[in-house]
């Protein structure tokens, strides 16, 4: 499945909630009909079956983290193999992706922008260039912007946007050096309550 390149607003309208795909703070203007699905008949959002609700939740989380379907299923399989709660394991695996960590640290205004920074070799992990967005960041890893990339206006703008977001307690960032430490994996209580990971577990358990 190819990565979606269309309007970001359409994805948020599809899920009926702001996925923050255009901005790290508030992606959608109040004039936009977020409660209406895209399309001519979007205002008549149909009642979903149990399966439909589970599928929508999976699609919502997949789109928030910018992960393709096959990748997402592989994350679920890995989460199911790990000890503990499968749903929480899944969210931790997604949170540990390098592109997500770069976004959480404020170096990218969105996860898509953070993914681009990683792909363009603008990011270091423990002093070495890593250009794989799905790279798994471990506890105490140091993630930094490469010296020659620090002058990029989009990174400076992203850091300003990040100042308006709630700062993750599991990450420590020095905005002056553009360097951060991934102190630990986030607990479930650290993450958005708008995600119901149990619905995803139920979907894949069928």
Swiss-Prot record:
Annotated Gene Ontology cellular component terms: small ribosomal subunit
A GO biological-process term: translation
Keyword Transmembrane helix: no
Pfam families: Ribosomal_S4, S4
Transmembrane segments: none
GO molecular function: rRNA binding; structural constituent of ribosome
Domain S4 RNA-binding stretches: 96-158
The keyword RNA-binding is assigned to this record: yes
Keywords: Ribonucleoprotein, Ribosomal protein, RNA-binding, rRNA-binding
SUPFAM superfamilies given in the database record: Alpha-L RNA-binding motif (SSF55174)
InterPro entries in the record: Ribosomal_uS4, Ribosomal_uS4_bac-type, Ribosomal_uS4_CS, Ribosomal_uS4_N, S4_RNA-bd, S4_RNA-bd_sf
Similarity comment text for this entry: Belongs to the universal ribosomal protein uS4 family.
Subunit structure: Part of the 30S ribosomal subunit. Contacts protein S5. The interaction surface between S4 and S5 is involved in control of translational fidelity.
Record function comment: One of the primary rRNA binding proteins, it binds directly to 16S rRNA where it nucleates assembly of the body of the 30S subunit. With S5 and S12 plays an important role in translational accuracy.
Record protein name field: Small ribosomal subunit protein uS4
UniProt organism field: Vibrio cholerae serotype O1 (strain ATCC 39315 / El Tor Inaba N16961)
Gene name of the record: rpsD
């Amino acid at each position: 499945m190819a990565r979606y390149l269309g309007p970001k607003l359409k994805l948020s309208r599809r899920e009926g909630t702001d996925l923050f795909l255009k901005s790290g703070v508030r992606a959608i203007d109040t004039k936009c009909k977020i409660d209406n699905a895209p399309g001519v008949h979007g205002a008549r959002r149909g009642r979903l079956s149990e399966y439909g609700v589970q599928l929508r939740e999976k699609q919502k989380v997949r789109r928030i983290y910018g992960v393709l379907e096959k990748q997402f299923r592989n994350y679920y399989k890995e989460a199911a193999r790990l000890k503990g709660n499968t749903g929480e394991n899944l969210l931790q695996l997604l949170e540990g992706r390098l592109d997500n960590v770069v976004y959480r640290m404020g170096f990218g205004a969105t996860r898509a922008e953070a993914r681009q920074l990683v792909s363009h070799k603008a990011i270091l992990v423990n002093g070495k260039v890593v250009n794989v967005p799905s790279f798994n960041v471990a506890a105490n890893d140091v993630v930094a912007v490469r010296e020659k990339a620090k002058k990029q206006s989009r990174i400076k703008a992203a850091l300003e946007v990040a100042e308006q977001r709630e700062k993750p307690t599991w990450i420590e960032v020095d905005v002056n050096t553009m360097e951060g430490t991934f102190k630990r994996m986030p607990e479930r209580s650290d993450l958005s309550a708008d995600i119901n990971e149990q619905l995803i577990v139920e979907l894949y358990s069928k």
